[in-house]
Amino acid sequence: MILACHNIKKAFGEEVIVSGGSFHIEDHEKAALVGPNGAGKTTLLKMIVGEIQADGGNVVLTRGKTMGYLAQHQDMNNDRTIYQEVRTAKADILDMERQIREIEQEMKHLSGERLEERMNTYQRLTAAFERENGYACESEITGVLKGLGFTEEEFAKPVATLSGGQKTRVSLGKLLLTKPDILLLDEPTNHLDLNSISWLETYLLNYPGALLIVSHVRYFLNRVVTKVVEIELGKLTTFMGNYTDYAKKKEMLREARMKEYLNQQQEIKHQEAVIEKLRSFNREKSIKRAESREKMLDKMTPVEKPMELHTDMHLTLEPSCVSGNDVLIVEHLSKAFPPQILFENISFEIKRGEHVAIIGDNGTGKTTILKILNQVLKADSGSFRLGSNVKIGYYDQEHHVLHMEKTIFQEISDDYPNLNNTQIRKVLAAFLFTGDDVFKLIGDLSGGERGRVSLAKLMLSEANFLILDEPTNHLDITSKEILEHALNNYTGTVLYVSHDRYFINQTATRIMDLVNHTFVNYIGNYDYYLEKKEELTAAYSNTSRLENNSSSATTDLASDSKLSWQEQKEAQAKERKRANEFKKTEERIGVLEDRSAEIDILMAQEEVYTNSVKCQELAKERAEIDAELETLYEKWEELAE
């Protein structure tokens, strides 16, 4: 065991964060700390590292072990470059190397006992340097920086010029390079693109120390952790397994506890009814038996009713009208912020009902495309047009569509003046804003709260074409699942940018990967994208070996993606047709199976089986149904392949 938290207690006034919870982390164990927004995850991490004092209990770190903590906000030395700042994580090793080089120079001018003394020091230092893998220090720094999405050209960038997200990546790099015995990470995937998240997953999987991580990224948690510690309603509960295992076990546990509670309540009601009946007999024996049952009830240990969180927002997305089949047509679009080219000459179409995800590395122009489509930015060249009857609903990750000086209530009432006060409060309550909360200024809200206001406006817009920029940012896992459910039931069209692979996998019917200034299309969800990308990578690798010219192979791959655009559109249309046919077949099978079951019930009724004419009619109908079902089952199997 490397870390143990015993009977931890913490409250801020009347708000209880933890009420006597305990958990532990074993050596080399990878654990997640999960819970709704505001449950106290970050507060608990700060208690563990000593930034916040617990009201009770204690935190024990095994003697001699080191702990590293990545907070959501970090301080930086603005006078250094990115590389210099990250290099400070290896200060001890670099100082050791400096001493070794100095002794090497000294020994050139020494002899006798003094030389022997310095030689012993030199051997001791070089042995320690090798143990710490000092000779690979610089390459390790470079590898971590590249893994976190920095190019070598960016290594010399001054820290003072970096964005908040870039500074967070620098801090994460420093922490990883210090290699403490246990890492505490608070939302480490924030500001990372898909490639960097994948790199971090692999790094942490191979990390020799222990890990306690706060994250809302389910793919990430599923791949990295083997234990989940839940903080909810002031209680700490430990579940073995990854996030999916935790979610299943939690639901099973909740159902079991509710069943136990309901069974006991039913038993209590039954006993009380029996007691009342016995007393109504008004006989000595009956009264004694009633008293005996009352004593039994008094001794019964009450099962506590499972507490349920009432913190789930309610989101329903319904378009007010149906758009034309062609929702968006983009032709030869280009954009650059010199000297950087984001994308050039891109063309694509989006049809009604599609859910399209745009993915790609940070800085490739994904959000820029959405801003161009919403006329926030202008393209350098090219054009786009919307189809007939298209109404856009826009979700901006930076929430520029919100007004910082307005209250939440004003934000809704000004945009939707037809809603009365009661209707506005009802909408806001669905997004967890109640009482005086509705009079908070937008500028004073957290990122998650602003996200909920933006989602409320999106719901009220009744748009039939949703354009969403990182819609899951700042949402807890439950809220993400609610958004996924709403989008999957949405009958309109969706175009979004996201780094949340689980979200993409659940909601996308098509993925456009922005790579090498153009789009590569994948008609499917994220799992399909990974599968096809591996095939493309293998094909690219084979081409490279055959031609021994990687640049030529890259050009060929990009050219192929452009040449196959028409084929991809045809394949997409074919897939939509197959999906529609598959759905119709399933629905018809369901109708026939229901009717078949009805016939079975009817033929078992006396008024039917004694009526030969009715029996023959039903038998004939049943035979026709069976024949049609046989055909439909075969068709379903073909369409499912």
Predicted regions and their residues:
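ABC ATP-binding cassette signature C-motif
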Residues: 1-262, 311-569, 574-641
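Short intracellular "coupling" helices and adjacent cytoplasmic loop segments at the cytosolic face
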Residues: 110, 276-288, 305, 432
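Short amphipathic coiled-coil heptad-repeat segments
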Residues: 142-148, 273-277, 295-302, 598
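Intracellular alpha-helical coupling/juxtamembrane segments of multi-pass membrane proteins
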Residues: 249-274, 286, 290-300, 304-306
